[in-house]
Amino acid sequence: KLTDFNHVAIDGTIKKAYNSNNNVITKKETQILLDYFNGLPVSQEMLEKLHKPAQKIFENKDMDVEDKIELLYDIETQFTFTGQDKVPVNDIEARFMKGKKGNFMIAYNIQSAVDYDTKLICAINVTQNPTDHYELPNIVERAIKNINTKPKYISADTIYLNQISLSYLADKKIDGLIPNRK
């Protein structure tokens, strides 16, 4: 037996999505295109003022009107879901997140659970949440399912220290090794 998975370490990282920060569409542009493709009156001037990503959707010959409307409704749903005012065109499920250098980028939050002793990956979870605050229960559940055992210890950095994480660990009877905030 290689390991007992006695101690599992949790961490998250922000990974840039396949989308430029400039390749985004705004709420207003989405609504203009939806109005246009649904047959409502839209001025030529408004269509000409669309930024390049919105123009590409408007002019795309490979998509029929129904596909464009479906894409635009999906984008509109992302505005509602995220509260953000811009959505990436190439990857509408990615989110603006703060990177390690403090810059904002279109990205995903990747959570990992790794066996402390052997460095074997127990679980990976890709999320749209821009911070790690409430990710501990999800990634630990995935790890327990994958390794088919409950670790005795879970270690994580300070960002995971909150009532939700602590209650989860207490309910599971797992010792949490999470430092206090400074």
Feature names for model-found ranges:
Residues K1-I174, P179-R181:
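Polybasic low-complexity intrinsically disordered regions
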